[in-house]
Regions:
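Short arginine-rich
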Residues: 219-226, 507
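Alpha-helical transmembrane bundle of multi-pass membrane proteins
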Residues: 1-216, 232, 239-545
């Protein structure tokens, strides 16, 4: 029987074109995050920016703070948005995040002193963190199983697209007024202001009736039994959240008390603690493979390996953005087919080889790159190799896995905690890397190499061998029908409990089953209504193979 596990992603995305469009819209949050990651590295080396903030230009430690203060704000935003998204809904938390983001962006791009710059970047980062927490969760809950990995990978693709365009905007605006003493302040204010426009687009969405939204997304009439069942499932999910909190904490428990207890359970309940450790360790390891350290300080790095001249420097940096973006596309197309674990292992191997090469070249030619330019370009190429390998592996899996491994009742807060851990690690990396590059030079990349190796070993021994089965894709094409029986990975909730211990998933399953019975949702009837569609899909696939 021909396999189409994960569904060839292009066909799946075309079939679910409205969901794909909505996913692209929601992924603007990722574009904003990526844009800032890329734009700040170019702005830091612009002549007028250095003249405007002379203390910042001469102090590597202060540079680390101006970069990392954004990630500190993002950590706070990701942490607080867990309960906010549960309370206000995913959509309204996205809109709130964009308002906060816009305020920070305006302060940052109009900064007249370091205090304004720091405050603007912190507020801006808070909005970024809120978006980074809720967008992957929103996409994973919105998507049918067969294209879930592809849609959530769009978050990473949008990040890389933001990084790519930021480099080239920096490259273009650096010539406003010249690249020397006469350079205009617009050279760096314009790149910082550009990020306001995608945020304004994202903040203009309008509310529609839930059933009409489903009609548009699924492209079936309101009378379709599957659509009605999905609508009831959404209603069941709301009832499930309310009933779970009442059963666990009592009817009179305050929202603050419930939120505190749920965060506490992530560390005190054994099976939740194991899932939390896996989700948070993945975020921590990702940052210390070196990605954001490279993205934030690329111009300084390329200058240190002999690529002299501001234009050459920014060109080399711009290629990083292109490689990053193009290398993310295979993950969007094939991640559901490859599986998370295999992708992480292959990515760890590729990143380890690249980091070893960069570190060794720098150690050997550290003081002679000027007279050995080929060695500098070789190091540059291996940085591109690292970026490409990172992009198709942990860059995408990092956003997906935290949304997949937790029981429904606590998923929002767990994802918020995992993303907050990402930003804590990002903050530390952004803060210490400038000093590492100055003091231990090539040792910085040996440090990153160690974490690339740890990623491979940790994934091999600790990440479960699971990927979505073809049967599940055919049996449950609508996401909400699936949620009653399975976690977001496509692994039955009972099996997730076996992997991590505990029985909270099974308890959730029984609770959802009771609610479904109350609402009259009947999976057997839904299954019969799918038979003809499944036969048509199989005939199409067999004819194409």
């Amino acid at each position: 029987m021909p396999s189409h596990m994960g569904h060839p992603a292009i066909k799946g995305l075309v079939k679910e074109i409205r969901i794909f469009g909505l996913a692209c819209f929601a992924s603007i949050g990722g574009l904003l995050f990526g844009y800032d990651q890329g734009v700040i590295s170019g702005v830091l080396v612009m002549h007028n920016f250095a003249a405007h903030f002379p203390k910042l230009a001469s102090d590597a430690g202060l540079q680390g703070w101006v970069v990392s203060i954004m990630t500190l704000g993002a950590m706070c935003g990701a942490f607080i948005n867990g309960p906010i998204s549960d309370r206000l809904s995913r959509r309204w938390s996205i809109l709130l995040a964009n308002i906060i983001f816009l305020i920070g962006s305006v302060i940052q791009c109009s900064a007249q002193n370091l205090s304004m710059l720091f405050v603007g970047r912190f507020i801006f980062g808070t909005g970024i963190g809120m978006l980074a927490m809720v967008c992957p969760l929103y996409l994973s809950e919105l998507a049918p199983l067969n294209i879930r990995g592809a849609l959530v990978a769009l978050q990473q693709l949008s990040i890389t697209f933001g990084i790519m365009i930021s480099f080239w905007i920096n490259y273009g605006t650096q010539y406003i007024g010249g690249t020397g003493v006469g350079q205009s302040a617009a050279a760096w204010r314009i790149p910082l202001a550009v990020q306001c426009f995608p945020s304004l687009i994202l903040a203009t969405g309008r509310e529609e009736e839930a059933l009409q939204v489903l009609v548009k997304m699924r492209r079936v009439p309101e009378t379709d039994y599957r659509l009605r069942s999905e609508f009831l499932e959404i209603k069941a999910a709301r009832m499930f959240d309310k009933q779970t909190k009442i059963e666990k904490y009592g009817e009179n428990a305050s929202r603050v008390y419930v939120a505190v207890q749920e965060y506490k359970e992530l560390f005190t309940v054994s099976h939740l603690r194991k899932r939390t450790m896996v989700a948070c360790l993945l975020q921590f390891i990702q940052q210390f493979t070196g990605i954001n350290a490279i993205i934030y300080y690329e111009p300084q790095f390329f200058e240190s390996i002999g690529l002299s001249g501001n234009s050459v420097n920014l060109l080399a940096t711009g290629v990083v953005g292109i490689v990053f973006f193009l290398s993310t596309i295979p993950a969007v197309l094939y991640l559901d087919r490859w599986g998370r674990r295999k992708t992480l292992i292959y990515g760890a191997i590729g990143m380890s080889i690249a980091q070893l090469a960069v570190a060794t070249l720098w150690a050997v030619y550290q003081d002679t790159f000027i007279i050995h330019p080929s060695a500098g370009w070789a190091a540059c190429v291996f940085v591109w190799v690292y970026i490409g390998t990172f992009a198709f592996s942990i860059a995408c899996v990092n956003w997906i896995m935290p949304s997949e491994m937790f029981p429904p009742g606590i998923r929002g807060k767990a994802v918020g905690l995992a993303i907050a851990c990402n930003y804590i690690s990002n903050f530390v990396a952004a803060l210490v890397v400038p000093k590492m590059l100055k003091t231990i030079a090539s040792g910085t990349f040996y440090f990153f190499l160690v974490f690339c190796i740890i990623l491979g070993v940790w994934t091999y021994f600790c990440v479960p061998r699971r990927k979505v089965s073809e049967y599940l894709i055919l049996r449950f094409p609508f996401r909400s029908l699936l949620m009653s029986h399975f976690s977001l990975t496509g692994v039955p909730i009972e099996e997730m409990d076996k992997l991590f211990g505990g029985n909270e998933g099974e308890a959730d399953l029984r609770r959802i089953a009771d609610i479904r019975t109350q609402l009259g949702v009947d999976d057997d009837n839904v299954k019969e209504s799918f038979i003809e569609e499944i036969k048509e899909d199989n005939e199409h696939i067999e004819g194409a193979s």
